[in-house]
Amino acid sequence: MNNTDNLIDKNPSKSNNKITGELVNYQNESYYKISNSHAMRPFFMSIVSDSNHWMFLSSNGGLTAGRKNADFSIFPYYTDDKITELAETTGCKSIFRIQKNGKNYLWEPFSERQAGLFTIKRNLYKNIYGNKIVFEEINEDLNLTFKYQWNSSDEFGFVRKATLINNSEKDLGISILDGLQNILPYGVGSDIQGIRSNLVDAYKKCELETDSGLGIYALSAIIVDKAEPSEALKANSVWSLGLDNPTYLLSALQLNDFRRGLELKQEVDIKAEKGAYFVNATINLASSQEKNWIQVANVNQTVSDITRISEMIKRNDHLEDTLSKSVEQGTKKLIDLVASSDGLQLSNDELINTRHFSNTLFNIMRGGIFDDNYTIGKEDFITYLSKANKKLFLNIKAPLQNLPNEFTLEFIKDLADKDADKDFKRLCLEYLPLKFSRRHGDPSRPWNKFS
């Protein structure tokens, strides 16, 4: 393919790049839209969930994400400046070869590699609940729109929904290469990734289960400086739906081959390279039609977890519907959590309503909420005692097992009154049955380690 075919003489006026912000209805949900976000300096965002997902993104597409804390990452956890700078090599990457009017065009949305080559417009959408974000690029020269959405599912992990729309009056032949790059294997903590990333690369092992198209990202062994066995028994995983019979890539080694128009070879087993998950397929996109596909990434997966997902993909038991329902269930749970702390309000100003929801959400993420009328769970209470006073816990460990699975605040007060140990009394009265709280911190504040 001749890359000079891409050179379309355009000189967009500055008026086309006016930055605006407004609330819009998108896919039956309220989103705040920033038009022409590419005309702004990159800024940092966070995406929340009702569960233990965390995701920090730059407006240029760079991101880090994982579950629980920075040691369970699917993309490297760095400071925000590095995340912004590594947008070309970490996270989402999409490249399209388009046949139009007898010519071939190469389009790489959201990439600075093609800055000034096409007349484009980039928009950002974030839903009012803060758990979904959409990146959109409109190519006015090729009359194409590409967008992708990040959201999450407690059961399945991180969900990326990609959409390619043909805005022209002609059918287009399009070769797609789309996916994720710089995927971490399980067992790589943020500390070792930050200072010994080349050593981590040497231990990486990426495998494809060809029947289901599921990518498995693991270490050949857990990296330890001890003379002892250290098997890596878990992995991170990525899988996809929506494209028929795609070619799968597990690294970024063939990206330039695709840019040059060369045929790609499926990768099944890649060692000592940064992990990636790309799907390659050729489609015919009719005028005014769109093509959708999905990629799902998760961390901390056991052999049984991976086997279960693989079987679900092969059976294809309405998996896309199951995935969508899981995502929407997460949104409903998030709303319920905020509602429990009076985070829902209705006024004449939708932006004020959204601001109040957001403020309440981040307050309860910091401080937590009292769930189910202050009901206390035995396991959480026992864990609390074991960490608060280890010596005391060893003495009362056996009697604690006789507690009911759930009990009330009055029950724990009565328990404290009947016990002669002053430390136990104090710990009972100090215990707070909070949920949803987490230690704060993010890539812009690296001195704080969140959890």
Regions found by a protein language model. Give the residues of each.
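Anionic coordination/interaction segments
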Residues: M1-S451
